[in-house]
């Protein structure tokens, strides 16, 4: 994580120290679908397929050289995910009696993230006689998770209980990711361009909040018959996504 952050910071520092001969600002809008999945450094959280979300936002870019720009903005990202993990749950129907059993928890979640990207954009010269240019971007994004909806399904033999819903407090409110992308832009008028691109985003921060996973139904994280410690360290859920974006600059 530290090496990735250092790499991004170095790129941005180099770009800011470059010549300011080609200064210029552009503003615009973008939107598009994203395809989300989760990873886990420990392997304790097992991804259960790719989910489809959506991004929408405003973008701004500052050209500090003819073919180089700093890109930022604000986006609202609607993200989804699903993963399984083993854990103990109290399955007793009597309040005064506890009966913790090891089963499989299937977790589905939806989050709304307000995100500010900070990217270095590198653009090619015009391709042939067409007003078309290709670009690549690298940088990071930082945001805040405003809303989380989570549903857990606990499975143990014939038991399939979907009543328990995790709370927002179980998820980290802060969001930071590495992002790379590429695409093309087409000039319609002197100051108007449309663009389409593809990007990949990988989280730096564990999505599970420290200390947020203690509830009346779950104890500490379990694997097999051994207690492995606090769940936020063992699950270590990282959000990944590939997005397609379409937009316009004015």
Task: Give residue spans per PLM region.
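Short loop/turn motifs that connect adjacent beta-strands in outer-membrane beta-barrel proteins
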Residues: 20-25, 67, 125-133, 188-193
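Outer-membrane beta-barrel translocator domains and adjoining extracellular loop/strand segments
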Residues: 39-45, 82-89, 147-159, 208-215
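Glycine- and aromatic-enriched membrane insertion/assembly motifs of diderm outer-membrane
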Residues: 46-101, 114, 248
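Short glycine/proline- and aromatic-enriched beta-strand/turn motifs that initiate or cap beta-hairpins
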Residues: 20-59, 241, 247-250
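Extracellular loop and loop/strand-boundary signature of outer-membrane beta-barrel proteins
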Residues: 41-47, 101-107, 163-170, 228-234
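Predominantly the C-terminal beta-signal and adjacent terminal strand-loop region
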Residues: 175, 180, 185-250
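Residues on the lipid-exposed face of transmembrane beta-strands in outer-membrane beta-barrel proteins
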Residues: 29-33, 56-62, 74-76, 116-122, ...
